[in-house]
UniProtKB/Swiss-Prot annotation:
Residues 44-281 form the PABS domain. It comes from Pisum sativum. The lineage of its organism: Eukaryota, Viridiplantae, Streptophyta, Embryophyta, Tracheophyta. One of its GO terms (molecular function) is spermidine synthase activity. The active site is at D200. This is Spermidine synthase 1. It comes from the Eukaryota.
Length: 334
C-alpha cells in the first residue's frame, strides 16, 4: 500500500482565484433562481458554462444528479453526475474536468514536458488539486520527488471522494502536498531545484493574470535546473489568440532554450480544445516535438491504468498548428 502524501499548510493568498467578471450557471425550465451559495438550480436541468472569455456561446451538459455543492474559502465547488460525460467537477461555475475526457488534458500537460527530457527526477505541480497530473507524473519511474502546491484543500478532499481514479495520484509516496499559494511557493523554492514545473492554472483574467506574465515565468525559470522544462495551460487558439501572443512574448524574453505552443482536444472545454506553452531554460537543448523519454511500458501503472490519450505520435502532432495560429506565433519571435 502506498504511503499517504506528506501535507504542508499555508495561509498565503490563492493561486486559483474567483473570476469576478464571470457569469456562470445553469439553465433550467423549472427554476433560474440563484441559490444561497451562488449556484443556480440544476435539478433537473442543464449546466451551462458562460463567460466573457468566450462571448456569444455556451457549453451545456445534462445534469442527472448533483453529488456535492460547497463553498470553500476561495471558490464555489460543485460535482454532478452528467448524462454523457460521467461525473463533472465545477469550480466557480467553470468546468474543470469530466470523467470522460479528463485524460486528454491530464496526460498531455504532463507527458509533453516529461517525455521531452531524459530521466526527470524532481517535478513541481502548481494547482492540479484534483490529482490527475500527479497520477500521470507518477507513471515516470525516474521521478523521485513530486511537489504539488494547491490553494484549496476542499478541491483535494472533494476529488478524493468523488474522483478516486483521478485523485489516486495523491497516494504515491513520492508526493508532498502543500496547501497554499503556488506563486509564493515557487518564489521560495531554491534556485535550480526542479527538472520540470507543470502549471495547471485557471484562465488569465482578474488576479490570475499574474500567472501568465513575465515575473511569474521568471520565478519558474529560477526554480528550474539548466535545461529544465515548464508546461502551462495556454488557452484556445480559436478564442484567445491575443492572449497566446502575449504569453509567447513573455516566455521568449525569459526562457533562453526552446519555446513552443502545443494543443489538444478536450470536448468540454470552450471551443473543444486547450493549448499548452512549453519552454526550457538555457542548458542542455530540448526538442519538445520529438520525445526522448518514453513512458516505461513495464511501469506498474500501465497495467492497471493504461494511457487513454497520449502516445508518441500524438506528442509530435500536438505541435502542428493551423496556418493562422502558426503565423501569429511566428510574428512574435523577434
Amino acid at each position: 500500500m502506498a504511503a499517504p502524501e506528506n501535507t504542508l499548510h499555508s495561509t498565503d493568498s490563492p493561486l486559483k482565484r474567483q473570476r469576478e467578471d464571470e457569469v456562470n450557471g445553469v439553465s433550467d425550465t423549472l427554476s433560474k433562481e440563484p441559490q444561497p451559495n451562488g449556484l443556480s438550480s440544476v435539478i433537473p436541468g442543464w449546466f451551462s458554462e458562460i463567460s466573457p472569455m468566450w462571448p456569444g456561446e455556451a457549453h451545456s451538459l445534462k445534469v442527472e444528479k448533483i453529488l456535492f455543492q460547497g463553498k470553500s474559502d476561495y471558490q464555489d465547488v460543485m460535482v454532478f453526475q452528467s448524462a454523457t460525460y460521467g461525473k463533472v467537477l465545477i469550480l466557480d461555475g467553470v468546468i474543470q474536468l469530466t470523467e470522460r475526457d479528463e485524460c486528454a488534458y491530464q496526460e498531455m500537460i504532463t507527458h509533453l514536458p516529461l517525455c521531452s527530457i531524459p530521466n526527470p527526477k524532481k517535478v513541481l505541480v502548481i494547482g492540479g488539486g484534483d490529482g490527475g497530473v500527479l497520477r500521470e507524473v507518477a507513471r515516470h519511474s525516474s521521478v523521485e520527488k513530486i511537489d504539488i502546491c494547491e490553494i484549496d484543500k476542499m478541491v483535494v478532499d472533494v476529488s478524493k471522494e468523488y474522483f478516486p481514479d483521478i485523485a489516486v495520484g495523491f497516494a504515491d509516496p513520492r508526493v508532498t502536498l502543500n496547501i497554499g499559494d503556488g506563486v509564493a511557493f515557487l518564489k521560495a523554492a531554491p534556485e535550480g531545484t526542479y527538472d520540470a514545473v507543470i502549471v495547471d492554472s485557471s484562465d488569465p483574467i482578474g488576479p490570475a493574470q499574474e500567472l501568465f506574465e513575465k515575473p511569474f515565468f521568471e520565478s519558474v525559470a529560477r526554480a528550474l535546473r539548466p535545461g529544465g522544462v515548464v508546461c502551462t495551460q495556454a488557452e484556445s487558439i480559436w478564442l484567445h489568440m491575443h492572449i497566446i501572443e502575449d504569453i509567447v512574448v513573455n516566455c521568449r524574453q525569459v526562457f533562453k532554450g526552446s519555446v513552443n505552443y502545443a494543443w489538444t482536444t478536450v470536448p468540454t472545454y470552450p471551443s473543444g480544445m486547450i493549448g499548452f506553452m512549453l519552454c526550457s531554460t538555457e542548458g542542455p537543448s530540448v526538442d519538445f516535438k520529438h520525445p526522448v523519454n518514453p513512458i516505461d511500458e513495464n511501469d506498474s501503472q500501465q497495467a492497471a491504468r493504461p494511457l487513454k490519450f497520449y502516445n508518441r505520435e500524438i506528442h509530435s502532432a500536438a505541435f502542428c498548428l493551423p496556418s493562422f495560429a502558426k503565423r501569429a506565433i511566428a510574428s512574435k519571435e523577434n
